[in-house]
Amino acid sequence: MIYGILSHVPKIFFKPAYDLYERYLLEKVKAGVLPKHVAIIMDGNRRWAKKREKPPWYGHLFGSKKLEEILEWCHELGIRILTVYAFSTENFKRSKEEVERLMQLFEQKFRELVTDKRVHEYGVRVNVIGRKELLPKSVRDAAEEAERATRKYNNYVLNVAIAYGGRSEIVDAVKDIVRDVMDGKLRVEDIDEELLKKYLYVPNMPDPDIVIRTGGEVRISNFLLYQIAYSELFFVDVYFPEFRKIDFLRIIREFQKRERRFGR
């Protein structure tokens, strides 16, 4: 009965309590050990759009806006590295219209990054990781322009995984190592886990402390397979466009309570 009454109360009446709880969580999180690297599988854009009887691109558009919010949250907390899974190699199998819309959105967002005042004010370096040769030339050009425009920055790092697959990344790294062995630049005896890291799409990047997947699915979907061996995994039910700051803070708070053993 009480739930039935509360469900008819306008949400605006709960906002002061919500804001108070968010500030409380923020203070708790800031007082603890913060992750250096957060990775996100941005899942649920299409289902979020379908729930609203909108086409898939509508969900992807709102997903891109959510990513901008998350960048602000990371800046506020001092989380230096954010890696997001935007488009897998398997996603090319989606409908032609959806893929074309997504490519247009990627191109637009990369070009916006070049002139975004926050990117330059915060010192955000942009890396686009994946098999970029699979992307349309206009998207590749826009991605490379964003990388060039931010190459000198090192305060924060945004890795955008597009046309990406974790297995493909490992295969590409192994191919490069084999070439260097054949060219006499490396000895077989030199090959170890640390050397392989130097051949990944972003060489020597610290492994993610946290991996978050939105959308309710409990799987990794070929994301950063080499890098997440000891990452803390969090799966949340909300679709990516609905992912709130309070959800983000709760995850980090839970991360701070866990004992990381790194296989020991």
Curated annotation (Swiss-Prot):
GO biological process assignments: polyprenol biosynthetic process
EC number: 2.5.1.89
Organism: Pyrococcus abyssi (strain GE5 / Orsay)
Cofactor info, note text: Binds 2 magnesium ions per subunit.
Function statement: Catalyzes the sequential condensation of isopentenyl diphosphate (IPP) with geranylgeranyl diphosphate (GGPP) to yield (2Z,6Z,10Z,14Z,18Z,22Z,26Z,30E,34E,38E)-undecaprenyl diphosphate (tritrans,heptacis-UPP). It is probably the precursor of glycosyl carrier lipids.
Catalytic activity: geranylgeranyl diphosphate + 7 isopentenyl diphosphate = tri-trans,hepta-cis-undecaprenyl diphosphate + 7 diphosphate
SUPFAM superfamilies: Undecaprenyl diphosphate synthase
Family: Belongs to the UPP synthase family.
Pfam families (UniProt xref): Prenyltransf
Binding site for substrate: 44-48, 60, 88-90, 92, 94, 213, 219-221
Gene of this entry: uppS
Positions with a binding annotation for Mg(2+): D43, E232
Cofactor requirement: Mg(2+)
Keyword set includes Nucleotide-binding: no
Taxonomic lineage from the root: Archaea, Methanobacteriati, Methanobacteriota, Thermococci, Thermococcales
Subunit structure: Homodimer.
Active site: D43, N91
Gene3D superfamilies: Decaprenyl diphosphate synthase-like (3.40.1180.10)
Protein name (database record): Tritrans,polycis-undecaprenyl-diphosphate synthase (geranylgeranyl-diphosphate specific)
GO MF annotation terms: ditrans,polycis-polyprenyl diphosphate synthase [(2E,6E)-farnesyl diphosphate specific] activity; magnesium ion binding
Keyword tags: Magnesium, Metal-binding, Transferase
